[in-house]
């Protein structure tokens, strides 16, 4: 096949990407209406639909290419020509970076993730100089207090596109003004510039106003989550200006935002200033471009191994019965490979484990489940693998290994953010932090349950602690929907000797769970038991879990807050009605 056919193939792939991103924007643009109508089930469906759009369109393009030329894929020289032609289509293309990832996905689908080399794939971007190009149209508007902060805030909020009444706009303006005046020097605040993104960021049951405050030579986040009340009005729930708070809002354990972004690279660069700790991959994922986020994720790994001389090692912590986990001492991610054989007590299959990871990808993670990136045929230099890890790989996952001489290929693995295992964290911290993390752990369980997720194995080793001190679940092999579980009370013993028997005196079905038992394997330490009884004793009662199930079955969708409850304006003690005169003071 000649150069004309290469043009045809390249154009077909790019047109397929155009179709995919057009549908992506179409689903995203419906976020405002779903929010205004408080159609939370439609929000969940749209989230799952948008995630699956990408693979669907990759499949459509692959079928087209097979029709164009059934032999396509067996001539490696020809594939390199197609990539050259495709690269030539990108210099003036507004979403070139994601178009490159789409090309990669089509290639991987055609060639079953084989021969992943830079001449056939965009391992690195073809146009690095354009990554930080000028934005063709402003992504935000500038607002100035001009000695009247409240008036400026009123203008910002009244300019929002939402077609819903405010519950009490003057109260909310007072709360925001008061918070800002307590956070920043008042004189500097009145001379600040507020840059407000043109588009709202939608997720779960909230619409987020995202902005920046330029003050005193510094730039701070300015985030306002907007929620519904029960009467159809809207209100501002809090104001966040701290980098750590903003990082949690855009965190890796949360669902992707719905934000209209025809130029995602421009939005990523705009966000970077208020999320300096976030990598490029995390920013793309946060705005819903998760497949390109995966491309950047891999590039960040390549950058790490290029500049680091560390070897990959077995990850610290208790070894898993289902997963072999490894990392590098200073790398912020871990690699997880499904073992060829599981421990006898694990009644799951490899297929079931992969289904669990897909469920987490598509479900609302409520800030409590780590996002993962799935890779096939992952190649690593043998020299970068420690002897202990190599031995473990050959022992636990030999069926997933392929020897390539000085390299080794792992047929399937996951990569996710590295955290401190909760059980290790609890052994190392002082009393105050121990109490805090027990509170966090219980909150994580409750928030997952409210989102219709039952973790299955609730042992501390299956949870991690982030750099912000949040507890996140990361072991998914026993995960299931809350509505699939039968929560039972333990029946009273028939005879005194029943309690001494090695086997239960009552029947147990596969989906039966007895919350009373949680106390025995979670509270072996008296300090932990005391904190659990103080803050989360309801987790040990079957009635609590059954009540949650009823709420889920009735269609109730819980609110999810990406910040501490004490930060909510509704927790303030001031009187809620204020005159405009006081607001403006």
Swiss-Prot record:
Pfam families: AceK_kinase, AceK_regulatory. The lineage of its organism: Bacteria, Pseudomonadati, Pseudomonadota, Gammaproteobacteria, Enterobacterales. Its main location: cytoplasm. GO terms for biological process: glucose metabolic process; glyoxylate cycle; tricarboxylic acid cycle. HAMAP family: AceK. The active site is at 371. It comes from Photorhabdus laumondii subsp. laumondii (strain DSM 15139 / CIP 105565 / TT01) (Photorhabdus luminescens subsp. laumondii). This is Isocitrate dehydrogenase kinase/phosphatase. It catalyses: L-seryl-[isocitrate dehydrogenase] + ATP = O-phospho-L-seryl-[isocitrate dehydrogenase] + ADP + H(+). Belongs to the AceK family. Keywords: ATP-binding, Cytoplasm, Glyoxylate bypass, Hydrolase, Kinase, Nucleotide-binding, Protein phosphatase, Serine/threonine-protein kinase, Transferase, Tricarboxylic acid cycle. Its EC number is 2.7.11.5, 3.1.3.-. ATP binds at residues 315-321, 336. Bifunctional enzyme which can phosphorylate or dephosphorylate isocitrate dehydrogenase (IDH) on a specific serine residue. This is a regulatory mechanism which enables bacteria to bypass the Krebs cycle via the glyoxylate shunt in response to the source of carbon. When bacteria are grown on glucose, IDH is fully active and unphosphorylated, but when grown on acetate or ethanol, the activity of IDH declines drastically concomitant with its phosphorylation. GO terms for cellular component: cytoplasm. It is found in: Cytoplasm. One of its GO terms (molecular function) is phosphoprotein phosphatase activity. The keyword DNA repair does not apply. It comes from the Bacteria.
């Amino acid at each position: 096949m000649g150069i004309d056919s290469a043009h045809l193939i390249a154009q077909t792939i790019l047109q397929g990407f155009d179709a995919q991103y057009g549908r992506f924007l179409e689903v995203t643009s419906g976020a405002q209406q779903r929010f205004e109508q408080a159609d939370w089930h439609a929000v969940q469906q749209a989230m799952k639909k948008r995630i699956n759009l990408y693979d669907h369109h990759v499949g459509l393009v692959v079928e087209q290419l097979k029709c164009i030329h059934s032999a396509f894929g067996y001539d490696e020289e020809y594939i390199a020509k197609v990539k050259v032609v495709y690269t030539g289509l990108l210099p003036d293309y507004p979403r070139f970076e994601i178009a490159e990832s789409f090309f990669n996905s089509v290639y991987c689908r055609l060639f079953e993730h084989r021969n992943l080399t830079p001449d056939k794939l965009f391992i690195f971007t073809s146009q690095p100089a354009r990554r930080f190009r000028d934005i063709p149209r402003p992504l935000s508007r500038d607002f100035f207090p001009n000695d009247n902060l409240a008036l400026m805030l009123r203008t910002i909020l009244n300019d929002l596109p939402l077609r819903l009444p405010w519950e009490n706009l003057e109260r909310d303006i007072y709360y925001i003004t008061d918070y800002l005046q307590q956070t920043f020097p008042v004189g500097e605040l009145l001379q600040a510039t507020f840059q407000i993104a043109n588009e709202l960021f939608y997720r779960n049951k909230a619409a987020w106003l995202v902005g920046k405050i330029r003050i005193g030579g510094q730039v701070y986040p300015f985030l306002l989550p907007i929620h519904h009340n029960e009467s159809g009005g809207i209100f501002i729930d809090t104001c966040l200006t701290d980098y750590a708070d903003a990082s949690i809002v855009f965190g890796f354990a949360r669902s992707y935002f719905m934000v209209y972004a025809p130029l995602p690279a421009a939005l990523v660069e705009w966000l970077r200033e208020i999320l300096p700790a976030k990598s490029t991959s995390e920013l793309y994922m946060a705005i819903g471009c998760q497949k390109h986020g995966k491309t950047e994720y891999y590039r960040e790994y390549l950058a790490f191994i290029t500049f680091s001389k560390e070897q990959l090692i077995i990850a610290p912590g208790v070894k898993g019965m289902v997963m072999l986990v490894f990392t590098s001492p200073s790398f912020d991610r871990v690699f997880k490979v499904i073992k060829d054989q599981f421990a006898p007590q694990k009644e799951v299959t490899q297929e079931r484990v992969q289904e669990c990871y897909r469920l987490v990808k598509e479900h609302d993670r409520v800030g409590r489940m780590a996002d993962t990136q799935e890779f096939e045929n992952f190649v690593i230099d043998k020299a970068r693998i420690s002897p202990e890890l190599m031995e473990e790989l050959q022992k636990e996952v030999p069926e997933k290994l392929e020897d390539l001489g000085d390299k080794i290929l792992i047929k399937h693995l996951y990569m996710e953010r590295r955290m401190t295992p909760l059980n290790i964290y609890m052994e190392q911290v002082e009393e105050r932090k121990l109490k805090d993390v027990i509170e966090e752990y219980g909150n994580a369980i409750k928030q997952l349950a409210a989102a219709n997720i039952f973790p299955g194995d609730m042992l501390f080793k299956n949870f991690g602690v982030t750099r912000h001190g949040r507890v996140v679940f990361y072991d998914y092999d026993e995960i299931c929907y809350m509505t699939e579980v039968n929560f039972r009370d333990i029946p009273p013993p028939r005879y005194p000797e029943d309690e001494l028997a090695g086997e239960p005196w009552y029947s147990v079905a596969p989906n039966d769970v007895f919350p009373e038992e949680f106390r025995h394997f979670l509270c072996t330490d008296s300090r932990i038991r005391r904190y659990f009884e103080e803050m989360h004793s309801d987790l040990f009662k079957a009635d609590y879990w059954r009540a949650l199930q009823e709420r889920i079955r009735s269609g109730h969708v819980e609110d999810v807050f990406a910040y501490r409850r004490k930060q909510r304006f509704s927790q303030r003690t001031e009187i809620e009605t204020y005159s405009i005169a006081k607001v403006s003071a």
